[in-house]
C-alpha cells in the first residue's frame, strides 16, 4: 500500500491554487495546510478543499511534524530562503521556477537540500507535456540521428501588467527560462554560449523598467549543436508553443495544441481552431504529471525528473542572456558569474 504524502502549500495565488486542485485528485496525497500572507482571504476556498488549517506564517508548515512535503508557490524573491528552511526542517520540496534570481542564492539553497538529504523538484512543467516528452523520446532513441538544430517558439497571448513585470525578474528569468530548460532537456547537452537580442515592442513602458517583451536567443551546446528561441509577450492568435528538432536522419516537430483537431476546408478558406489561449489550458496535463512524478520520487527515494541542478543551469542561461542583451555580444556560460553586471 502506498504511504500517503502529507503536503503543505506556501502561497495561494494562481499556481498555488492549481496545485491544490491537482493534489486533491491524487489518492495517496493530502494537503494539510496552506500558508498565505493574506490567509483570511482564502478561508472559504480552503474550506471547500477540506484543508485542516490556514496560516499567514509559512514556518507553521515547516514546524508541523505531519507534513512530509512543501510546495513553494510564493514570489521568487523568497524561494531560496524557503528552500533552505524547508530542507533544515527535513521536508521534501517542490519549488516553482526560478529557484532564485541570484545564482549564489540558488547554489546555497541546493547545498542545503544536499546537506539534509531531502528531495527537491523544480517546477519546469513543460518537461511533462506529452507532446514535448514525445520529442525527447524520439531524440533519445536516435530516430532523427544526431540533433544539430533546435527551434523553440514561445509566445504568450497577452502581456502581463506592469506591476507583475516589476517583480518578475525580467523576460529571461520569468518566461524564457522555461525554454532554456526545454533546450537542455531535449538536446541532452549543456549550453556553453548565449547570444540574446531583444526589445520592448509590444509595450514600450517595459523598457522603462529595464525589461523587454520580444526576444531572439541563440544557444550553443557543448556538443556543437545550436538552438534558436523566439519569445514574445503577445501573440494575438493564442498561446503559441512550438518545438522542432533537426538531426542527421530527419526532424521532429510539435505543433500548437488546439481545443479540437477539426479542420474545415471549402472553396473559400481552410480553417481550424486557434491555439489554446491560456497556459493552464495548454499545459493542464503537464501540471498534473509533474506532481505525480514528484510523489513517485519521494516514495521511491529516487532523484526527481527535474532537479535543483536543472533549476541552476536554466538560471545560468537566463543570467547569460541578460548579460548578452546588456553588452550586445555572445556570453560564455563559463564566465557568467564572473562578469560585473
Curated annotation (Swiss-Prot):
Q: Give the organism, scientific name.
A: Bacillus subtilis (strain 168)
Q: Which UniProt keywords apply?
A: Oxidoreductase
Entry protein name = Uncharacterized oxidoreductase YrbE
The answer to keyword Oxidoreductase applying to this record is yes
Which PANTHER family does the record associate with it? BINDING ROSSMANN FOLD OXIDOREDUCTASE, PUTATIVE (AFU_ORTHOLOGUE AFUA_2G10240)-RELATED (PTHR42840:SF3), NAD(P)-BINDING ROSSMANN-FOLD SUPERFAMILY PROTEIN-RELATED (PTHR42840)
Q: What is its EC number?
A: 1.-.-.-
Its family? Belongs to the Gfo/Idh/MocA family.
Q: Name one GO molecular function term.
A: nucleotide binding
